């Protein structure tokens, strides 16, 4: 057990680490809401590793961005099992329109730690990109988080 100094109770090591990552993500989120952008992959992966690391099941999330690539909202849309999460383009599109997003960045974690995207990851990314393009919402990247991270944009897959 680890004592978390800001709070007066004991947490397991995993809970402690998750809490620290959440607090780091909140600090980064405030930076991006105030005007910094997600135009650089390094900014994106730094933020997403804090948000998605440490889960024992897959999480698919979306960063909804304005025209200047500033954060409107980060939202975990789908939760899955240890090695898969079902993703529904209709729900992603609905959320993007609801917050009036001009662009999005997709993200999900691989609890195994291996960030290498699967063929299923590549297929759903293309389906999402096709659906969002119908309403002029740009897909800037899809980042897979494990022990490190992989950017679809950096690999030229978008």
From Swiss-Prot:
The keyword Phosphoprotein does not apply. InterPro entries: MPN (IPR037518), RadC_JAB (IPR025657), UPF0758 (IPR001405), UPF0758_CS (IPR020891). The keyword Hydrolase applies. A motif (JAMM motif) lies at residues 108-121. GO terms for biological process: proteolysis. Keywords: Hydrolase, Metal-binding, Metalloprotease, Protease, Zinc. CDD domains: MPN_DUF2466 (cd08071). Residues 37-158 form the MPN domain. GO terms for molecular function: metal ion binding; metallopeptidase activity. Coiled coil: none annotated. Zn(2+) binds at residues 108, 110, 121. Belongs to the UPF0758 family. This is UPF0758 protein VC_1786.
């Amino acid at each position: 057990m680890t004592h978390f100094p800001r709070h007066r109770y004991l947490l397991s090591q995993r809970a402690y680490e998750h809490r620290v990552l959440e607090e780091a993500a909140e600090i980064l989120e405030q930076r991006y809401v105030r005007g910094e952008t997600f135009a650089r992959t390094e900014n994106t992966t730094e933020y997403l590793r804090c948000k998605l690391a440490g889960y024992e099941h897959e999480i698919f999330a979306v960063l909804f961005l304005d025209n200047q690539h500033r954060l409107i909202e980060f939202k975990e849309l789908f939760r899955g099992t240890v090695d898969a999460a079902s993703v529904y383009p209709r729900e992603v599109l609905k959320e993007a329109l609801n917050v009036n997003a001009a662009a999005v960045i997709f993200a999900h974690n691989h609890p195994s730690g291996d960030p290498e995207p699967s063929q299923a990851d590549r297929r759903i990314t293309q389906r999402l990109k096709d659906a969002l393009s119908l309403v002029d919402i740009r897909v800037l990247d899809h980042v897979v988080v494990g022990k490190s991270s992989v950017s679809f944009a950096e690999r030229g897959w978008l």
